C-alpha cells in the first residue's frame, strides 16, 4: 500500500 502509508489524513505524513 502507498496511499495508506504516505497519506493518512489527505496529507503526506
Swiss-Prot record:
Extract the InterPro entries matched here.
Answer: Mcrtin_ACTH_cent
Name the family: Belongs to the POMC family.
Name recorded for this polypeptide: Melanotropin alpha
Q: Which UniProt keywords apply?
A: Amidation, Hormone, Secreted
As stated in the Swiss-Prot or TrEMBL entry, residues carrying the post-translational modification Valine amide are 13
What would you give as a GO molecular function for this chain, any one? hormone activity
* Major location category of this protein: secreted
Q: Name one GO cellular component term.
A: extracellular region
Pfam annotation, one family: ACTH_domain
Q: Where in the cell is it found?
A: Secreted
The cysteines covalently paired via disulfide bonds are none
